[in-house]
Amino acid sequence: GKILTLYKSYRNKYEGWVLPKGTVEPGETHEQTAVREVYEESGVHGTIIKYVGKSQYSFSIPEDTVEKEVHWYLMVSSGYYSRPQREEYFVDSGYYKYHEAYHLLKFSNEKQILEKAYNEYLDLKRSNLWGSKKYF
């Protein structure tokens, strides 16, 4: 029941705790991207349990506005070890309880997705499906 978060620090311009995410590579599905990015950014081997939803955001660069769409998945890992990907400016990573992760996260859209994913997790637990062979 803990949430993997990453701390990104990019040249003092971008700093804060985020959820793992990334860009779809040619020929990849959203699911493959999610599993690959979690591993690349944190060293964690995750297994998808359920699709949670998508979020959209944009940011400005000097010559344009970049639009992003992120597909989110509830995942499970076999342990609590993580290693931040320094090449992508991740300087820390860890697993946190829901309320800790919620308050750490920098972006409101990630907080909304976290809340939705956590409620999905609680529903599966209440139904005795979390950890069942149906999902593993």
Where are these regions (language model features)?
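Charged phosphate-binding loop/patch that engages nucleotide di/tri-phosphates or the phosphate backbone
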Residues: 103-136
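N-terminal strand-loop-strand
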Residues: 1-19
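Unchanged
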Residues: 24-112
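Short, charged/polar low-complexity linear motifs in solvent-exposed/disordered segments
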Residues: 22-23, 59, 65-66, 120-123, ...
